[in-house]
Amino acid sequence: MLWRCALQHFSFVKTLSRRGFLRNAAFSAGSVLILSNSASLGSAQANDKLNIALVGVGGRGEWFTSTIPRTENLVALCDVDETKNPDAYERLSKARRFRDFRRMLDDMGREIDAVIVATPDHTHAVASTAALHAGKPVFCEKPLTRTIHESRALRELARKQKLATSMGNQGTAAGPFRRALELIRNGALGEIKEVHIWNDSGGADRKQPPVAGGSAPEWLDWDLWLGPAAYRPYNKEWMNRHLWREFGTNQLGNWASHTANLAFMALKVQDLWLNASPSGNAPVIRVQAKHSGVNKLSFPKWEVVEWSIPAHAGFGPVTFTWHNGRAPGSRDLLEGLVGEGLDWGDKKDRKWADFAGAMIVGSKGRIHATGHNATFRLLPEDQFKDVQTGRPEQVEPSKGHEMDWLQACRGGPPAWANFDYADALNEFLMLGNVATQFESGLEYDPVAMKVRNHREADALLSCEYRKGWSL
């Protein structure tokens, strides 16, 4: 029931007319400008719907092939795997098909108004930057990128191009999410000193890379699937992005993009990235990871990552702790805070609200949020029984996560998950993936984008692209 209720907040509604956008295209310099190139504006005059290109039609891409056509034109479908989502190609027969998003942008640049990226993690950055360079607003699925450098590059390019952006952490649009944000900022929980976020999956902890597995099938463009990653012979095992650091981010990208979202935004942690102190004293975020063992190829079976956040934006210091897998002591700690047992494990009928979630602990009360942060409960329940939790009372409600971005594409306000915010959240999380590759703690300067105390860790903030690929 919680999941069905949460999905209601993501529903699409009738959009603003494109002609209305064009009539009001000259808005203030402080707003987010979009569709700024003449090619996009030219195609925008044709009708009231935006022409959307989708890069990645399987997985999360399936959602967009069903929802976007309700309000917009889905004019291009791009995927390196021809077997993905065949039903979409039948339903959207007028959409042009591509394997290479660069070719798509070259061939259809004048016809495309905006781009959605739903590829594996390691190609989020290259696909998104290609679209931004082409003057197209971008909606990129979470995690924003695989590395911290890629994330920062996306933020800076989106600012330079003055384009509407959003990351796909859908809980941001939920009424309860925005209500919880109000309660935290209004002091209903008192002073927040600790936040716990979790997922019970853990990592694969693979010790050896896959060996050559024969030729790639003809329906898959293996070279394009690899994208910016170093070339290696085909093996389908590489395509499970949750197994390998070179291609994925595991649960810190997959789930913590959701579970950390409410506390990170409500406590304005992004200010450490976006609003540097006028005194010039750079903030330092300290992060320490415990784990089942260092694994630079894959991800540890379990991990506990602790970020120490300094005072900022009117909030005092706060500690975020990520619990992933069967980390010693984590389940007992979390069940004590939640006040009941958590349904962890592999059984198919487990409660989805238990295996991932967030606990925000204040001096006067606690918030237990579900995995997407789309619903929550206040604890102790008797203390807060008269507090409504379903809709915001002060901040603006959302018309739907994708809809907020589409309205920004038409000149509306920036989406809450725009790349300014999404970069900060993603850097924060990917710093955790760097920390799990070491035993010692790290000191990160979010303004300079630098690990101050560990040269090897600092080198992992970026990655080398193979020839022919760049941001």
Residue ranges and their predicted role:
Residues 223-315, 326-329, 335:
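Rossmann-like dinucleotide-binding domain that binds NAD(P)(H)
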Residues 74-91:
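NAD(P)-binding Rossmann-fold cofactor-contacting core
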Residues 1-16:
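N-terminal secretory signal peptides
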Residues 11-14, 20-40:
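N-terminal export signals
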Residues 35-71:
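C-terminal segment of N-terminal export signals and the immediately downstream linker at the start
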Residues 120-121, 125-173, 187:
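Beta-strand-loop-alpha-helix segment that lines the small-molecule cofactor/substrate pocket
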Residues 295-297, 308-399:
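NAD(P)-dinucleotide binding in Rossmann-like oxidoreductases
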Residues 196-239, 462-464:
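Core domains of carbohydrate- and sulfate-ester-processing enzymes
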